[in-house]
């Protein structure tokens, strides 16, 4: 098991900084070890990583950007929502369920248009139905980030070490 190199004050950081600092350490570790598939990460660490990808993409450009950037399958076809529910996180998974239905309808089209060079603002105009869930996500994330940080703090060893015990 490998202890991550983390800032001394990491456990005192505000919730989003705590989450993003951990995921940054995971990605740095996997880059250094050549583990491009992130296979050394535990299920909980994968969940946290997926959440941070979700959060960064949706906060920047909504679900359309998440899909156009190629993260749709990673977020919607993996058990992220169910894993968050197991952590007692409720608001974000509800939004993910609604956005997933739109992804199933429009995901391939958005990905194809993005691969063809369409920019995010024009894609957002073409798929305005995602806007409602973008707004719902912003509210849900604000509510759930402290709960995520609390879960991480309560299970610190699970998140601060990589590899098998």
Curated annotation (Swiss-Prot):
Signal peptide: none annotated. InterPro entries: DMP19_C. Activity can be modulated in vitro by crown ethers, which are small cyclic polyethers that can modify protein surface behavior dramatically by stabilizing either intra- or intermolecular interactions, thereby probably altering the protein's tertiary and quaternary structure. It comes from the Bacteria. It holds the Pfam family DMP19. Acts as a DNA mimic. Interacts with DNA-binding proteins and prevents their binding to DNA by occupying the DNA binding sites on the proteins, acting as a competitive inhibitor. DMP19 is a bifunctional DNA mimic protein involved in controlling nucleoid formation as well as gene regulation. This bifunctionality depends on different oligomeric states. The monomeric form interacts with the DNA-binding protein HU, which prevents HU from binding to DNA and forming nucleoids. Belongs to the DMP19-like protein family. Monomer. Homodimer. The monomeric form of DMP19 interacts with the DNA-binding protein HU homodimer with 1:1 stoichiometry. The dimeric form of DMP19 interacts with the Neisseria hypothetical transcription factor (NHTF) dimer. The dimer exhibits a double-stranded DNA-like negative charge distribution on its surface, which facilitates interaction with DNA-binding proteins. This is DNA mimic protein DMP19. It comes from Neisseria meningitidis serogroup B (strain ATCC BAA-335 / MC58).
